[in-house]
A protein has these predicted regions:
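Flexible "cap/lid" loop of the alpha/beta hydrolase fold
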Residues: 143-171
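Acidic catalytic loop of the alpha/beta-hydrolase fold
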Residues: 239-244, 272
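Conserved acidic catalytic loop of the alpha/beta-hydrolase fold
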Residues: 100-117
Length: 340
């Protein structure tokens, strides 16, 4: 039998698989007997991060943060997220509240072989994160809260009507014209996909029971007792955040008074610091406050905190170099494959 040879005029390309189209949703039966939908993206040897998205988000909302996917992989961070009750493709169970969800999350982490885990909550993910870390505080490596509810913020009654959100879910996600998210190519389009997935993945006529329950839990459930938490905590807030104002951060700092804490308050920024400073959150997960993400001259650097003021005074900015590109700059052209 003749040996198989490459065609004499063939170019060899490096591609051997499909490129990612966002996190892959998996399902597993956990200890309670319930089936959970989850994502698990990253190597087994990477730092595990449990991600809890904002109010009404599905497990694929993490895709909105994958504009820094290569940076996350370079740092070596594995992301696990568990879809909340009745959202996305998860079946609604009226018996599943904050504590039941927390138990299912820990059961899944046990199955995945994850012991110590960093926990990140964005916005409406805050109360769920509190229930999770209160259940097993000794297994929390670090806690990261990005403009996260401690309890239902005041002045949000009009925003938290499930039927109103269901009538126009995209409006729930609408960012101001000056928001930094508009600098991220494709972000607004991806937001529309997430908004509709959150409410209509099971069909147009399925009632928004999961979202309704979440809104009720925000109002009725007090912040869990976190006095047993010893892991370092990192808080990220915009000083101009009107949806989750700084008073909410104060509730967290009081509840976590016994922990080492880093507060990152960004002047004049609003309810989008979770995107604009996602790179810093990743760095804090990896280095536990030991590095600041900053860039200058098109180069991203991880500097020590003591150098931050001098670096910024010399023309640097916080964040990866992509944030230095003008918002109206055209997309970078595809550079083409490297053939050999």
């Amino acid at each position: 039998m003749k040996a198989v040879r490459d065609a004499s005029e063939a170019f060899q390309v490096r591609n051997t698989g499909f490129d990612p189209m966002g996190p892959v949703v998996c399902s597993k039966v956990v200890g309670s007997g319930r089936t959970v939908n989850y994502i698990d993206d990253g190597g087994a040897g990477a730092v595990p991060l449990l991600f809890l998205g904002g109010a009404g988000t599905t497990v694929r909302a993490f895709r909105l943060l994958e504009f820094a996917r290569s940076f996350r992989h370079e740092l070596g961070i594995r992301v696990v997220s568990v879809e909340r009750n009745g959202l996305g493709q998860s079946v609604f169970d009226p018996a599943v509240g904050l504590d039941e969800y927390a138990a299912d999350v820990w059961s899944l982490l046990d199955t995945l072989g994850i012991g110590q885990v960093s926990v990140l909550a964005i916005s409406g993910g805050g109360p769920y994160a509190a229930a999770i870390i209160a259940a097993r505080p000794a297994q929390v490596r670090s806690l990261h809260l990005a403009c996260a509810f401690a309890e239902r913020p005041e002045r949000t009654d009009a925003l938290m009507e499930a039927d109103t959100v269901a009538a126009d879910p995209v409006a729930w996600w609408r960012f101001p014209a000056d928001s930094s998210v508009h600098s991220i190519p494709g972000f607004v389009d991806s937001v529309i996909e997430e908004a509709t997935r959150g409410l209509f993945a099971k069909g147009r006529d399925v009632p928004p029971d999961g979202l309704s329950q979440a809104f009720r839990l925000y109002e009725s459930e007090p912040l869990r007792d976190l006095t047993s938490v010893q892991a370092p905590a990192f808080l990220y807030w915009g000083s101009a955040d009107e949806l989750v104002p700084l008073e909410q951060m104060g509730r967290w700092t009081a509840a976590l008074a016994g922990t080492a804490m880093v507060e990152r308050v960004y002047l004049d920024e609003g309810h989008d610091v979770q995107y604009r400073h996602w790179d810093q959150i990743l760095a804090d997960v990896k280095f536990l406050g030991g590095r600041i993400v900053a860039s200058r001259g098109g180069r991203t650097q991880l500097i020590v905190p003591e150098e931050e003021a001098e670096f910024l005074a010399a023309g640097g900015i916080l964040g990866i170099a992509a944030w230095q590109r003008p918002t109206d700059a055209p997309p970078e052209p595809f550079r083409g494959p490297t053939l050999r």
